[in-house]
Amino acid sequence: MSCCGGNCGCGSGCQCGSGCGGCKMYPEMAEEVTTTQTVIMGVAPSKGHAEGLEAGAAAGAGAENGCKCGDNCTCNPCNCGK
């Protein structure tokens, strides 16, 4: 079985394809799967504060922290499933 379906995962910040961050993204959960539900109740900040974060995340979707995903995965360390 290839790592994350053959997606490239570089460092802690790169997430390529299907939102996967690479091999052993959560090593402590490799053997068991648990489900947790969290309910947060409170007051959220106005939309204006979050818009900058969303725009920044969209801009770095293809290459993040020097990671180029796909056939030419270039980063250190690079974890590409074959």
Swiss-Prot record:
Induction: By sucrose starvation, heat shock and abscisic acid (ABA). Not induced by heavy metals. The keyword Ion transport does not apply. One of its GO terms (molecular function) is metal ion binding. It holds the Pfam family Metallothio_2. Metallothioneins have a high content of cysteine residues that bind various heavy metals. Belongs to the metallothionein superfamily. Type 15 family. This is Metallothionein-like protein 2A. It comes from Oryza sativa subsp. japonica (Rice). The gene is MT2A.
